[in-house]
Regions:
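Amphipathic alpha-helical packing segments from all-alpha helical-bundle domains
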Residues: 97, 123, 134-161, 170-174, ...
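Generic hydrophobic, amphipathic alpha-helix propensity
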Residues: 20-29, 45, 70-78, 82, ...
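Helix-turn-helix
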Residues: 23, 27, 31-65, 69
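Hydrophobic alpha-helical connector segments
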Residues: 83-120, 176
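Amphipathic C-terminal alpha-helical segment
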Residues: 113, 157-158, 177-195, 211-215
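Amphipathic alpha-helical segments used for helix-helix packing
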Residues: 115-134, 185-193
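N-terminal intrinsically disordered/low-complexity leader segments
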Residues: 1-19, 89-96
């Protein structure tokens, strides 16, 4: 065999302590982006980072540990996507109208992320987790709020401005969330998976309007 064609041994990289964890996490995020939660495998993450498999255990003792870290990063990315939509909201002279627009922006950001970053979206919700009272900043966006907290804040503002009756505020997160989350999966892998972009925009707009009016 020609020496030039011989497979060269993998080059092992050296990292400072924190840098290796970051490299492994970035590799895990890339895997999730490509194939969802099932693609997040510790051995493959170490291969992509260019280190021996045993090196990972100082930072992630198991695949589950890596998946939890990747999941937190995915939730943070989702929060940032929602924040970006909120930032685009044009403030109205009427506080209630601004509150409604903000709630719609939360739903719009959620759906956009689900469709544009499907692997990360699946990963974000791959493990059952408590959302109320979660103070893990690894799951938060630039505002320091995670996706659930951003939704809660939007609903609080709806109630404060009279756009949402105060007696209907408790638990409203789960009503709005279940509707938008359900639509996301109908588009990702359900009967709407073959819908055109125009059709998806139309049904998304109708659903967000329904959520706003139905709460």
């Amino acid at each position: 065999m020609n020496a030039a064609k011989k497979k060269r041994p993998a080059v092992r990289k050296t990292f400072h302590h924190g840098d290796l964890r970051k490299a492994l996490l970035e590799a895990g995020i890339a895997l999730a982006r490509e194939g969802g939660p099932n693609a997040v495998v510790l051995r493959e993450a170490t291969r992509r980072a260019g280190v021996a498999p045993n090196a990972a255990y100082r930072h992630f003792s198991s695949r589950s540990d890596l998946l939890q870290a990747v999941r937190a990063a995915a939730l943070s990315s989702l929060a940032r996507a929602i924040e970006a939509e909120i930032a685009r909201v044009r403030r109205s002279k009427l506080p209630a109208d601004s509150a409604r627009a903000t709630l719609r922006a939360v739903g719009t950001g959620y759906l956009k992320f689900a469709l544009e970053e499907t692997g990360l979206f699946r990963t974000a919700f791959s493990v059952p987790d408590r959302v109320e009272g979660d103070v893990d900043l690894a799951k938060a966006g630039k505002s320091g709020l995670n996706p659930f907290q951003l939704l809660s804040a939007a609903l609080d503002r709806m109630a404060e401005t009279g756009a949402l009756p105060s007696e209907r505020r408790p638990g409203a997160e789960y009503l709005a969330w279940s509707a938008v989350h359900g639509l996301a999966f109908l588009i990702i892998e359900g009967p709407l998976s073959r819908a055109s972009q125009k059709e998806i925009r139309a049904v998304s707009d109708r659903l967000l309007h329904m959520v706003e009016k139905g709460l």
